[in-house]
Design a protein with these regions (language model features):
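Canonical alpha-helical transmembrane segments
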Residues: 25, 40-64
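Juxtamembrane "helix-exit" motif on the non-cytosolic side of transmembrane helices
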Residues: 22-32, 73-86
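Membrane-water interface at the C-terminal end of transmembrane alpha helices
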Residues: 5-11, 100-128, 147
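Alpha-helical transmembrane segments
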Residues: 7-24, 64-65
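Exposed beta-strand-loop-beta-strand "reactive/processing" segments of non-cytosolic proteins
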Residues: 171-206, 210-212
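Short, non-transmembrane alpha-helical segments in secretory-pathway proteins
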Residues: 144-178
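Internal/C-terminal transmembrane anchor helices
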Residues: 124-149
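Central hydrophobic cores of alpha-helical transmembrane segments
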Residues: 57-72, 132-133
Length: 213
């Protein structure tokens, strides 16, 4: 009985943890359109969820939808999408598209995790199962690597843009820096909001160097 309770508790906590990660990536999508980070994190986490939870991992997308919906209700207009000058219907469509992209990434990871579990069952050695899991986790990153190449791209892009803003913009105090991924330009950009209300835009060029727009 005690072992069963512990197993249920562990399963529930893992579902909540993986769902929370999915919700955080959704938040990053609607706040900064951060597609690269989502493609980097969500598939790998979903592979791990399937390996640890098995069939119960399919509760993760469901809980993610619930958490994302709750966030959207509480956040209201406090996201990048709501700042767009467009109709409420268009905003709703974009929010749905963000959630749909997240779900696709989750199910790709879950599918790869399921394949890893099937192959792992044919091998009783734990080391072999771990290796298979790692291989499929790496495979889940193939679309991201084909598009963005650098595994640390989201982190390095944010760091370079913020550092460049601090070093080069000195004529006015900086009130805020918002880094986002431009879907139209396919690169990270930064809106630097000055204390006088002016906004200056920075971006990363093809070589990964920060520049002013």
């Amino acid at each position: 009985m005690r072992e069963q309770r512990w197993k249920r508790l562990r399963t529930g906590l893992l579902i909540i943890a993986f769902s929370a990660i999915g919700m955080l990536e959704y938040v990053q999508l609607v706040q900064a359109f951060d597609l690269p980070q989502m493609m980097l994190v969500v598939p790998v986490v979903s592979v791990i969820a399937m390996l640890l939870l098995g069939k119960y991992s399919f509760f993760v997308p469901v809980c993610t939808i619930v958490l994302a919906s709750a966030y959207q209700i509480l956040a209201g207009s406090e996201n990048a999408i709501a700042e767009l000058r467009t109709s409420a219907r268009s905003i709703a469509i974009i929010l749905f598209e963000c959630l749909l992209v997240l779900m696709i990434a989750q199910f790709i990871g879950l599918g790869l995790g399921a394949a890893a579990r099937i192959l792992g069952k044919k091998n009783k050695k734990r080391v072999v199962k771990i290796v298979i899991g790692v291989v499929f986790a790496v495979v889940s990153l193939v679309p991201y690597l084909l598009l963005f190449h650098n595994p640390l791209y989201p982190m390095t892009a944010r760091h370079r843009l913020k550092s460049f803003a601090d070093k080069t913009i000195t004529d006015y105090p900086i009130a805020d820096k918002k880094v986002y991924y431009s879907l139209n330009d396919s690169r990270y950009m930064c809106r630097v909001i000055m204390s006088d209300g002016q906004v200056r835009v920075l971006y990363l060029d093809e070589n990964g160097e920060a520049k002013r727009q």
